[in-house]
Swiss-Prot record:
Regions of compositional bias (Basic and acidic residues) in chain numbering: 634-644
GO molecular function, one term: phosphatidylglycerol lysyltransferase activity
Function: Catalyzes the production of L-lysyl-tRNA(Lys)transfer and the transfer of a lysyl group from L-lysyl-tRNA(Lys) to membrane-bound phosphatidylglycerol (PG), which produces lysylphosphatidylglycerol (LPG), one of the components of the bacterial membrane with a positive net charge. LPG synthesis contributes to the resistance to cationic antimicrobial peptides (CAMPs) and likely protects M.tuberculosis against the CAMPs produced by competiting microorganisms (bacteriocins).
Annotated positions binding Mg(2+) 1: 1040, 1047
Protein known as: Lysylphosphatidylglycerol biosynthesis bifunctional protein LysX
One BP annotation, GO: lipid metabolic process
Region of interest (Phosphatidylglycerol lysyltransferase), ranges: 1-632
SUPFAM superfamilies in UniProt: Class II aaRS and biotin synthetases, Nucleic acid-binding proteins
Cofactor: Mg(2+)
Length: 1128
C-alpha cells in the first residue's frame, strides 16, 4: 500500500534519474504560511478511542501466545506429546496448529504483531482465514452432524463479528516497499527450502513410502500448507526432519520480511529535496542544537510542519517511530512538526519515541503528550574558557605535552580543503580503525565521511613526525560558532594521548576557525557513574551503577564518561521521550538497534546516498535542490521577523517607503541649525533662522498649516502658508510629515495673524521619520511604568521630565565644582572588585573569563580611596556608579551614583559642614535658591528653606525621645529587647546592643524625620570602619544625614589603627562565613595598605540620587534617566 504523505503535506515525486544529481528549478521564495497553519495544533487524536479499542491488543496477545506455543511444541517433542490432544482439537476445529512447523509459528507471530499494531491488511487476512475456517466447520456439521464443529463455527462467527465491529480500530497502513522483490525472495527461498527438504527426507525418510509423498511432505512442511493434513500421507519422517523443514520455511519467510522492511525504509528515507529543505531550515533556524546537523543523515525519514518551517527526522525500528534530537527549524513551528510526526506514527501504527532531545526540545515533545526520561549528558567545551592550566586538566596537559615532545603535531582543516584522493585514504583509515563491525550512531552520527555537501565540517588529525596519521576527529557544524563531534578514530598501534592532544589543540586554536563551542561525546546515565561512585551512595544507586559497569564491557558506557570528564566540560542534559511506560522495553531495543548497540539481521541502512522515492517537502518550500545542497532561499527579512506592527506604525512605514521611492532621505546627514528655538524666539522680527526640533502639533486649515516645533530649549509655532511656499510644497508637508517627526525648518521670525510669535517657514527637510505615534497631546504618558520604560517619549513631550533631568545635571555639576574649588582631586577606582567591602550590603557578582575569577560589582569605593589617602592624597573624591543587590522602591535602585570624599587631618565634625554646604550649593544651582521641593497638602510641590545650620542629635538621644525611656551605650540587651517589644520593633535574638539600637533608630527615628538632621555617634558594632568616639565609650564618630525619612549621606572619623581595623573586619568576615550576605569580607590588600600608616582623616559618603530627590521632590525613578525596571 502506498505511503501517503502526512496531513497538510503534498507529495512531490522526483523525476527519474534526478535523485543524486541535477537541480530542480523552482521559484526562489520561502513563502510565509497562512495564519491558520501557524495556529497552535490540537492534540493528536489517536483513533483508537471507541468501545472496542482494546480488541487489536487482545487479538494480538492471543495470537502471540498461540504462536509461541506453536514454536515450543515444534521444538520440544516432550511438550508436543503432552499437548497432543488439545492441540489436535484446536487444529481440527478452531485454528491450524500443526504438530511440528516453525514456519507456521512465524506466520502466526507476524500476524499477531500486525494485528496488535492495528494493521488493516492483517485484519483482512485474519477475518478471511477465520471465515473460511467457519465455513469449513459449517460444512462438516452439515455432513457429519459434528457438534464440536457447530460450536467452533459459532465461536468463529462471533469472533469474526467482533472483528468486523472493531473495523474502525484497524486503521493503520503499511508503508510502500518492494513487495514484488520480497515475494520473489519468499518464493525463491521456499523453493530452495523445498529442494533441500526433499533431499533431507530422502536421506531420513522414516516411514514415508517412496514416490511423490516424500517431495510432497517437504513442500507441505516447508510452506506450512495448512490445507494438507498428516493423514494424507502414508507415514512420516524422523521428528527432527520436520523441525528442519519448518525452519527452512521460516528462514525464507524471515528473509522476505527483512527484504520488505529494508525496501520500505529505503523507499521512505530522505530524498535530495528533503535534505535540501533541512539544510535550509538549519540555516534559517532561530535555535542552534548541537545535534541539528545530524538531521541530514540520509537513512532517516522526515516529516515537515504544514508551513514547512520545521521538521522532525525519524527512523522506524521494530514498529517504533524513533525521532532523533530536537525538531529542525523555527521554534514557533516545532509544535506543528511534532503534531505531523505524531499523526504519521498514529497512521501507520508506530510507537512514537525520541532519542537525544535537548531540554528545550523535550519540553516541546512533552507538551505534545510524551513522557521524558533523562538519558544522559552531552559534554560541551566552551573554548573561550578552555585552558590547560590548573590541576583539573593535569592529565590532558601531560598527555598532550608528551606527544608534542615526540614531534606529534595537530592538523585542522575544513573538509573542502582536502583533495578527494586524500579523502579516500582518510575513509580507508576510518574503516580500518573502527573497533566495531558496524558504524554506531543514529542521532549523533552522519555515516557519510567525505561527502561533498559536508564541506564545512572540520577534520582534526594528529600527525607524527614521519607524517603518519595517528588519529582523527570529524566534527559537523553546530550553528554558526560551534562544532559537534561526529567521528573519532585512533590508530590502535599509536601512542596514548592522541585524543587528548587533538581535542585540546582544537579548543586552544578554535578562534581562527570562528568556533566558541565544541560538543564532544554523549555520556549515557552520567549522573549514575558520577554519584554512584561517591562515598555514601545508596544501595539502589550502587546497584544501578554496577549494572551499567557490567554492560560497559561491551558498550563502553563508563569509558565514554571517563574520556569526557577529563576536559572539565559543561554537561548539557539530553532526554529520552516515549508515550507509555509499558512500551519502554520495545522502545529501548529499537533505540539500541538504531544506535548500533545490538546486531542487525541483514545489511545496515545506507546513510551515504538518497534512497527515498517520495519527498515529504510541502508546497510552501521552493527553490530546493535534488542533490541535497542548501536551497536558494533569500536571507530572512529582519523586518518581517520582528514584532507585529500596529496599524498606525504600518501606515507610517508605508509613508517612509513612499518617501524613499520619491528620493527623499528621511534620515539625512547633519547640517547644524543656526539657532536654538529659544535663541530664535529672542531674535528680532524678520531674522532668518534655521532651527531643528520635533513636531508636536499640526493643524491644517487648507491654505495655511500651523505646527508646534520643540527642541530642548523651547517651543515655537511654525506657519506654512500655501501662497508663500506653493501648493505642491505645502501638500508635500501634509503628505510626508506626522506628529513626532524630527524636522529642520528655515524661515523668518514673524507673527501670525493672531499676533503669536511664529517662524514663517520657507523651506524644510526631514531629519528623522518617527515610526510610532506620540501619546495623547494633553495627557501624555499617564502610566508611570510607561514613563519609565519609554523615557525618551516622556522627555520629548513632557517639559517636567526635561526639567528634572536638567536639575540632576546641575546638582552633579555643583557637587563636582564645589569640591574642585576646595582643592579636592577627583579620581576613579575599580568597579570590578575581588573583595566586597566599604559598606554592609549584598553585592552583585560576575565572572571574568580571562582569569577564571569571580568578581563583585563594587558596593562602595571607600577602601580604594583610603589607599590613596595612605599614598599621600590629602583631599580626594570620587563621583561614580555603585551597585547593591537590594530592594527597589521609592528611594532605592540597584545601581546608583555615590559621592565619597576624604580629607586628611579632618574628622566627622568637619565633614558635617562640608556635606551641608555641598547640598545647599547644589540646591542653589538647581532651584535658584537654597530650597528643597516637598509636596504640599494638595500634592503640588512647594519650596522648603534648607539654608543655615541643621539640627544635630545623638542616636541614643533620638531613640530615647522616641521610646520615652532614656537609653545609653551602656543599656543592656535584655532592656533593649523589652523596649522593642513594647514599641513593636522587630529584632533577631542573635543581635547585640548596637544592632538593636540601630534597628530602633531606623524604625522610630529615621523614618519619622522631616527637616534635614544629623544623627551622630552610632554604636561601634555597626560601624566597623569608623574611629571610636574620643570621649564616649561604646560609640563611634559617625553621623547620618536624614531628611524626610530618607538617609542622604554619612561621614566618619576614619579608623586608622590597622590592628583594630583588622579585628573588626575579621569579625565581619566571620559573619560573612556564617551566611550574612551583607557582611564585609576581609580585604588583605587594604589592611596591608593601612599598616603603612594613614593620617587622621574625615570621610564623607553621599547618595547623589537622593540629593536630587531632596532638591527636586521626586522619587528616585523620576530622577534617573533610565532606572531598572522588570522585563515585560
Amino acid at each position: 500500500m502506498d505511503n501517503p504523505p502526512p496531513t497538510g503535506v503534498a507529495p512531490r515525486h522526483l523525476p527519474p534519474g534526478s535523485v543524486h544529481t541535477g537541480k530542480v528549478t523552482a521559484s526562489l521564495s520561502h513563502r510565509r504560511p497562512d495564519s491558520v497553519q501557524d495556529a497552535p495544533p490540537a492534540p493528536v487524536p489517536h483513533r483508537a478511542h471507541g468501545r472496542l479499542r482494546e480488541v487489536p491488543h487482545i487479538a494480538g496477545l492471543v495470537l502471540g501466545v498461540f504462536a509461541v506455543a506453536c514454536l515450543l511444541w515444534s521444538l520440544s517433542p516432550a511438550l508436543r506429546f503432552l499437548t497432543g490432544p488439545p492441540r489436535r482439537f484446536v487444529d481440527d476445529y478452531y485454528f491450524d496448529a500443526p504438530d511440528t512447523n516453525v514456519m507456521w509459528a512465524l506466520i502466526v507471530g507476524l500476524l499477531a504483531g500486525a494485528i496488535a499494531s492495528r494493521k488493516r491488511i492483517a485484519w483482512w487476512l485474519l477475518v478471511g482465514y477465520l471465515t473460511l475456517f467457519a465455513v469449513a466447520n459449517g460444512l462438516r456439521f452439515a455432513a457429519e452432524q459434528n457438534i464440536n464443529a457447530l460450536v467452533a463455527m459459532i465461536v468463529q462467527v462471533g469472533v469474526v463479528g467482533l472483528l468486523i465491529a472493531a473495523w474502525p480500530e484497524f486503521y493503520t497502513r503499511v508503508r510502500r516497499g518492494a513487495g514484488w522483490k520480497a515475494l520473489g525472495v519468499l518464493v525463491g527461498g521456499l523453493a530452495i527450502g523445498c529442494l533441500l527438504g526433499w533431499g533431507l527426507v530422502e536421506v531420513f525418510p522414516g516411514s514415508l513410502p517412496p514416490g511423490w509423498q516424500r517431495p510432497g511432505w517437504a513442500v507441505y512442511r516447508v510452506t506450512a500448507a495448512i490445507l494438507v493434513e498428516n493423514e494424507h500421507f502414508g507415514g512420516h519422517p524422523r521428528p527432527f526432519v520436520n523441525v528442519l523443514l519448518g525452519l527452512f520455511g521460516a528462514i525464507a519467510l524471515l528473509a522476505a520480511v527483512l527484504t520488505l522492511l529494508r525496501s520500505q525504509r529505503a523507499a521512505n528515507a530522505m530524498t535530495g529535496l528533503d535534505e535540501s529543505a533541512i539544510r535550509g531550515l538549519l540555516e534559517h533556524s532561530d535555535v542552534e542544537d548541537s545535534l541539528g546537523y545530524f538531521a541530514t543523515r540520509r537513512d532517516k525519514a522526515v516529516v515537515f510542519a504544514p508551513s514547512g518551517k520545521a521538521a522532525v527526522t525519524y527512523r522506524v525500528e521494530l514498529g517504533v517511530c524513533l525521532a532523533s534530537g530536537d525538531p529542525v527549524g523555527v521554534r514557533e513551528a516545532w509544535p506543528h512538526a511534532i503534531d505531523a510526526w505524531l499523526r504519521l506514527a498514529d497512521r501507520f501504527g508506530w510507537t512514537p519515541a525520541v532519542m537525544g532531545a535537548s531540554e528545550e526540545g523535550a519540553t516541546a515533545y512533552r507538551r505534545a503528550g510524551l513522557s521524558a526520561l533523562r538519558l544522559g549528558d552531552e559534554a560541551v567545551l566552551d573554548t573561550r574558557d578552555f585552558s590547560l592550566a590548573g590541576p583539573e586538566l593535569r592529565q590532558v596537559r601531560q598527555a598532550a605535552n608528551r606527544l608534542r615532545k615526540q614531534g606529534v603535531r595537530v592538523r585542522i582543516r575544513r573538509h573542502r580543503e582536502i583533495p578527494s584522493a586524500e579523502f579516500e585514504q582518510i575513509m580507508a583509515r576510518a574503516d580500518a580503525w573502527r573497533d566495531t563491525e558496524t558504524e554506531r550512531g543514529f542521532s549523533m552520527a552522519l555515516g557519510r565521511l567525505g561527502d561533498p555537501l559536508d564541506a564545512d565540517c572540520l577534520l582534526v588529525e594528529a600527525v607524527a613526525a614521519d607524517d603518519r596519521v595517528l588519529g582523527m576527529l570529524s566534527l559537523v557544524p553546530w550553528g554558526r560558532t560551534g562544532v559537534s563531534l561526529e567521528l573519532m578514530r585512533r590508530d590502535p598501534q599509536g601512542p596514548n594521548g592522541v585524543m587528548e592532544l587533538m581535542i585540546s589543540q582544537l579548543a586552544l586554536n578554535s578562534e581562527q576557525f570562528g568556533i566558541t563551542r565544541v560538543s564532544l561525546n554523549f555520556a549515557v546515565f552520567r549522573s549514575v557513574f558520577e554519584e554512584g561512585g561517591r562515598i555514601g551512595a545508596g544501595p539502589v544507586l550502587r546497584l544501578w551503577r554496577g549494572v551499567l559497569l557490567f554492560f560497559s564491557r561491551w558498550w563502553q558506557l563508563e569509558a565514554l564518561y571517563r574520556s569526557n570528564v577529563k576536559y572539565q566540560p559543561d554537561w548539557v542534559p539530553r532526554f529520552f521521550l516515549f508515550e507509555e511506560r509499558r512500551q519502554l522495553p520495545r522502545v529501548a531495543v529499537a533505540s539500541a538497534l538504531a544506535e548500533g548497540f545490538l546486531p542487525r539481521l541483514g545489511k545496515d541502512p545506507d546513510a551515504s546516498a538518497h534512497t527515498g522515492a517520495q519527498s515529504a517537502v510541502p508546497d510552501t518550500l521552493t527553490g530546493l535542490h535534488a542533490d541535497g545542497s542548501p536551497p536558494d532561499w533569500p536571507k530572512p527579512d529582519l523586518l518581517d521577523s520582528g514584532p507585529r506592527r500596529p496599524e498606525q506604525v504600518r501606515v507610517r512605514m508605508a509613508k517612509l517607503d513612499r518617501m524613499t521611492a520619491a528620493g527623499v532621505d528621511a534620515y539625512p546627514v547633519a547640517y547644524p541649525p543656526t539657532h536654538t528655538v529659544a535663541a530664535a524666539r529672542r531674535s528680532p522680527r524678520g531674522t532668518t533662522v534655521r532651527v531643528c526640533g520635533r513636531l508636536l502639533r499640526i493643524r491644517d486649515y487648507g491654505g495655511v498649516v500651523f505646527a508646534l516645533l520643540r527642541d530642548w530649549s523651547d517651543d515655537i509655532q511654525l506657519v506654512i502658508d500655501r501662497e508663500r511656499v506653493g501648493a505642491a510644497r505645502s501638500a508635500e508637508f501634509g503628505e510626508y510629515f506626522d506628529l513626532g517627526d524630527l524636522i529642520e525648518v528655515s524661515g523668518q521670525i514673524g507673527r501670525s495673524r493672531s499676533g503669536e510669535l511664529s517662524l514663517l517657514a520657507a523651506d524644510w527637510r526631514m531629519l528623522g521619520k518617527c515610526l510610532h505615534p506620540l501619546p495623547d497631546k494633553w495627557k501624555g504618558l499617564a502610566d508611570p511604568e510607561a514613563r519609565v520604560r519609554q523615557r525618551y517619549v516622556d522627555m520629548a513631550i513632557n517639559p517636567e521630565t526635561r526639567d528634572v533631568l536638567a536639575k540632576r545635571s546641575a546638582v552633579v555639576r555643583s557637587l563636582r565644582e564645589s569640591l574642585n574649588s576646595w582643592g579636592y582631586l577627583e579620581v576613579e577606582t575599580p568597579i570590578l572588585q575581588q573583595v566586597h567591602g566599604g559598606a554592609n550590603a549584598t553585592p552583585f557578582t560576575t565572572h571574568i573569563n580571562a582569569y577564571d575569577l569571580d568578581l563583585y560589582l563594587r558596593i562602595a569605593p571607600e577602601l580604594y580611596l583610603k589607599r590613596l589617602c595612605v599614598g599621600g592624597m590629602e583631599k580626594v573624591f570620587e563621583l561614580g556608579r555603585t551597585f547593591r543587590n537590594e530592594g527597589v522602591d521609592f528611594s532605592h535602585n540597584p545601581e546608583f551614583t555615590i559621592l565619597e570624599a576624604y580629607e586628611a587631618h579632618s574628622d566627622y565634625i568637619r565633614m558635617m559642614h562640608t556635606c551641608r554646604v555641598l547640598i545647599q550649593n547644589a540646591a542653589l544651582a538647581a532651584n535658584g535658591s537654597m530650597v528643597a521641593m516637598r509636596p504640599g497638602a494638595d500634592g503640588a510641590l512647594e519650596p522648603v528653606d534648607i539654608s543655615g545650620d541643621w539640627p544635630v542629635k545623638t542616636v541614643h538621644g533620638a531613640v530615647s525621645a522616641a521610646v520615652g525611656t532614656e537609653i545609653t551605650p551602656r543599656t543592656g540587651v535584655a532592656e533593649l529587647r523589652e523596649l522593642c517589644d513594647r514599641v513593636g520593633v522587630p529584632y533577631q535574638h542573635g543581635w547585640d546592643e548596637g544592632q538593636i539600637v540601630l534597628e530602633m533608630y531606623e524604625h522610630l527615628v529615621e523614618a519619622r524625620t522631616e527637616e534635614p538632621t544629623f544623627y551622630v555617634d552610632f554604636p561601634t558594632s555597626v560601624s566597623p570602619l569608623t574611629r571610636a568616639h574620643r570621649s564616649t565609650p561604646g560609640v563611634t564618630e559617625r553621623w547620618d544625614l536624614v531628611a524626610w525619612g530618607v538617609e542622604l549621606g554619612t561621614a566618619y572619623s576614619e579608623l586608622t589603627d590597622p590592628v583594630e581595623q583588622r579585628r573588626r573586619l575579621t569579625e565581619q568576615s566571620v559573619l560573612a562565613a556564617n551566611g550574612d550576605p551583607e557582611a564585609m569580607e576581609l580585604d588583605e590588600d587594604f589592611l596591608q595598605a593601612l599598616e603603612h600608616a594613614m593620617p587622621p582623616t574625615g570621610g564623607l559618603g553621599m547618595g547623589v540620587d537622593r540629593i536630587v530627590m531632596l532638591i527636586t521632590g521626586r522619587s528616585i525613578r523620576e530622577t534617573l534617566p533610565f532606572p531598572l525596571v522588570k522585563p515585560r
